Structure formats: structure tokens, C-alpha cells
């Protein structure tokens, strides 16, 4: 197998620890739409999926109010987003990969401008080869963005690894032909992530250990 050269990072839930914050945002806006509040992380994990439109459907959002809910969610999310922490070891892991000579790219379903603003909040925007988000706020698939990037970068898919926190990350990795490891600290539970058939770990440190072990084995 080709030696790992490039890490494709998911952002929300993987480097950014915004699970609890996302629940707070939902509970802040849903009453205005006469929708029920979330009562636990477990309930959120049961409902969350990609594309986000399907997640909203599971939460009771109809097509008629989808746009209104999406815009209200985004406005509330941005209001205090500077209070969201990074996951433990996020910066250390990015730096660890840099020292190991790996290229790193953020590949996110977040809207591009928002994504860049968030990375700037943590002083991370200069640590990645590319910052790739979507052109809208609806958090759809990021497969096409990732495919275009790999084709343009010259990095073979077999030399890249996706690190994420959702089944969608594993689906994107499979479609692109990259390796994948999932971290069960974000928007989907460990039980759900195990359905992907890829390694699942409980911390970024363990994810980094796995990536670097794979890199050495391939070398």
C-alpha cells in the first residue's frame, strides 16, 4: 500500500469540539418553530446524520420550514462560536503530523467563509495546505470537493487518510479511495461509527498513533 502523505481533516466534531454547543443552538431556536427540545446527547446521536437535511427531518423539520430553520441555526451558531473549544490534543496532533512530514487539509461540509473564520479564531488557518468548505450553509456532501482537491494536488488517493467523526467521513473516504479513521468524540456515537467498518478510536492522540503507525508500515 502507498505510504501516507496527506491527512484530510474533518472540522466540526473532529478538531472542533462543538457537539454540546450544537445541541445548545438547536434548543435555542427550535421553540420558535414549535419543535421539541433535545434532552440528551444520546438523543442527538440517534438523530444526527448526513446530509443535514435528513437530520432535520428526523428532528421534525418539514421541507416548508427547512430554509428558515437552517438560517436561524446558522445565525445562532455564529453568535457565540468564539466560545467553542477545540478537542483535547487538536493542536498537538496537527503539529505532530507536521513534524512527521505529512501534508494536512481541512475538508468540511461547513460553509467556506465560516470555516475560514473559525480556523482563524484558533490561529490554525496557516497550518493547513488547503481549507475546503462548501458554498452554502446546508452541510451537504463534501465528496466532490475532496475529489477535486486530490486531483489538483497530485496526491494519490491511496496516500491520503481521512480523519472524521461521522459515517459521512467514512463514506467520503471510500468514494475517494482514501483510508479512514474515525474518532468517537463528536456528532455520532461509537456504536454508529462501528458500522463503517474502519478503525474507530476515542481520542485524536490514538488517531495520530494509528496514522503514523500506518505510515511507518507502508514505508
Where are these regions (language model features)?
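A short, structured active-site edge motif that brings together acidic residues
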Residues: 42-44, 125-140
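Glycine-rich phosphate-binding loop signature in dinucleotide/nucleotide-binding domains
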Residues: 2, 100-102, 153-157, 214, ...
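Conserved H-loop
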Residues: 36, 62, 125-129, 156, ...
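Acidic, Mg2+-coordinating phosphoryl-transfer loop and its flanking beta/alpha structural elements
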Residues: 161-199
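N-terminal helical cap/lid subdomain that shapes the substrate entry/recognition surface
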Residues: 2-92
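Structural recognition of alpha->loop->beta junctions
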Residues: 122-133, 192-211
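Conserved Lys-Pro-Asp/Glu-containing loop-to-beta segment of HAD-superfamily phosphomonoesterases
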Residues: 6, 142-171
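Short, acidic loop-to-helix structural element flanking the phosphoryl-transfer center
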Residues: 79-106, 112-116, 143
Amino acid at each position: 500500500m502507498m505510504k501516507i502523505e496527506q491527512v484530510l481533516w474533518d472540522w466540526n466534531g473532529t478538531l472542533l469540539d462543538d457537539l454540546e454547543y450544537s445541541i445548545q443552538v438547536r434548543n435555542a431556536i427550535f421553540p420558535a418553530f414549535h419543535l421539541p427540545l433535545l434532552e440528551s446527547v444520546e438523543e442527538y446521536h440517534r438523530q444526527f446524520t448526513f446530509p443535514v437535511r435528513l437530520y432535520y427531518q428526523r428532528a421534525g423539520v418539514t421541507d416548508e420550514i427547512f430554509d428558515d430553520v437552517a438560517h436561524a441555526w446558522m445565525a445562532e451558531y455564529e453568535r457565540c462560536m468564539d466560545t467553542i473549544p477545540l478537542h483535547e490534543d487538536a493542536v498537538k496532533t496537527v503539529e505532530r503530523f507536521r513534524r512527521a512530514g505529512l501534508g494536512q487539509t481541512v475538508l468540511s461540509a461547513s460553509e467556506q467563509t465560516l470555516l475560514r473564520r473559525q480556523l482563524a479564531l484558533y490561529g490554525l488557518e496557516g497550518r493547513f495546505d488547503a481549507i475546503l468548505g462548501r458554498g452554502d450553509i446546508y452541510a451537504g456532501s463534501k465528496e466532490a470537493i475532496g475529489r477535486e482537491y486530490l486531483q489538483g494536488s497530485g496526491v494519490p488517493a491511496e496516500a491520503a487518510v481521512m480523519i472524521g467523526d461521522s459515517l459521512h467521513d467514512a463514506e467520503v473516504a471510500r468514494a475517494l479511495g482514501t483510508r479512514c479513521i474515525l474518532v468517537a468524540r463528536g456528532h455520532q456515537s461509537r456504536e454508529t461509527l462501528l458500522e463503517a467498518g474502519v478503525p474507530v478510536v476515542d481520542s485524536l492522540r490514538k488517531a495520530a498513533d494509528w496514522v503514523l503507525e500506518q505510515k511507518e508500515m507502508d514505508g
